[in-house]
């Protein structure tokens, strides 16, 4: 993944697929001019890294929380959210049903001036859980399941059942202030996209109703939270 200014490249290694479009990987930052290669983070595999418009920051998701790395400060890493929890709350990446329905794997953007982060949060605490059996298989072989099958449990909303509750949030990188954005949406509605614009005071959030027959686009100020 090339930075917008062309000075750096994010290189993924040890990639592990999560769902159809999502994956975890150990990312490295390659600096083109110096040919220097550095780990993006030492805290564990990352998901959905995004560059700031000036190429000086990278935001990513780990364990359902958002982290920020500042290249100008020795790749210093800070944690943005702390409420992420497996099978309960997801920040910055879609849950299974949103990824599958709307074909995306990242719900995290910078504003145009790189001063703020905005993302979608998925509260799946009330979604019912489903378990799959895992067998040895092939390509890849899961040797730990060669004798006895393992299990994989995740939140799987069937038709008519409760979906994740979605909301949009912003983070001021300088003040560390987190705010919920004011987006009109029914409790069972969707936010299938969050998009930055050339205006640092505007991001665009798409919303849909549960039946997916009404699409609205909201221009939101991430500082005032008003749409």
How would you label these PLM feature ranges?
Residues 1-227:
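Beta-propeller folds
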